[in-house]
Amino acid sequence: MSWQRPDGRTAAQLRPISFQRHFTRYAPGSVLVKFGDTHVLCTASVAEEVPPFLQNTGQGWLTAEYRMLPTATQQRQPRETLKVSGRTAEIQRLIGRSLRAALDFHKLGSRTITVDADVLQADGSTRTAAITGGYVALHDAITWLYKQGLLDPAQGSPLRQQVAALSVGIVRGEVLVDLCYEEDSQAEVDMNIVMNEQGALIEIQGTAEAGCFDRSQLLQMLDMAQAGIQELLRAQRETLNL
């Protein structure tokens, strides 16, 4: 029996996507991103310092942190206080790697941008929402640096490319994009794809949760993810008035 998507979407259809910029008052960049019922608050802050391994190089850095509100899921999850879980550490490293691909660190200068992704409500695909919304917050933080006179327009923008991410998987033999939690929990294959606007791959995370998948299915997942990511990139440009 084929899988019927809980919200009635077609296999290649994204959930409703929205970005609410300047969501908080103090962060140079902030956005509330919604992928359907997955809501993530992404903020980007700036510190005029770099990690020890970059001191005296003139290069900047970007790092990311990821957390979930205890009541982001149906059952309350304890806060991660003294030590983050392996899942959290993996996700925040993914977010950091993905967004670092968007930057030219020589043009950023000797400063660090921290992107915080806080999941307010989770219905699957939180990490891909965090990356996609994190780029919007990062873009606004770079704009803030220009307004503060901390970046020289003559040097060119530190932003070298757009970045967005999308989940894709196989549920009951069918390839689907932008999985909700119910679909993710039933998936035989679960993947997260990160790309830029040229369609170049930044990261692929893929796991066969049950059984395996073949090359043709992999290529189909990549093709459907690329089409969906192009929609996300267009949505980013629209919200940023680019």
UniProtKB/Swiss-Prot annotation:
NCBIfam families: RNasePH. It comes from Synechococcus sp. (strain JA-3-3Ab). Belongs to the RNase PH family. The lineage of its organism: Bacteria, Bacillati, Cyanobacteriota, Cyanophyceae, Synechococcales. Phosphate binds at R87, S125, T126, R127. Homohexameric ring arranged as a trimer of dimers. One of its GO terms (biological process) is tRNA processing. The gene is rph. GO terms for molecular function: 3'-5'-RNA exonuclease activity; tRNA binding; tRNA nucleotidyltransferase activity. It is an enzyme of class 2 (transferase). This is Ribonuclease PH. The keyword RNA-binding applies. It comes from the Bacteria. It catalyses: tRNA(n+1) + phosphate = tRNA(n) + a ribonucleoside 5'-diphosphate. Its EC number is 2.7.7.56. Keywords: Nucleotidyltransferase, RNA-binding, rRNA processing, Transferase, tRNA processing, tRNA-binding. Pfam families: RNase_PH, RNase_PH_C. CDD domains: RNase_PH_bact. Phosphorolytic 3'-5' exoribonuclease that plays an important role in tRNA 3'-end maturation. Removes nucleotide residues following the 3'-CCA terminus of tRNAs; can also add nucleotides to the ends of RNA molecules by using nucleoside diphosphates as substrates, but this may not be physiologically important. Probably plays a role in initiation of 16S rRNA degradation (leading to ribosome degradation) during starvation.
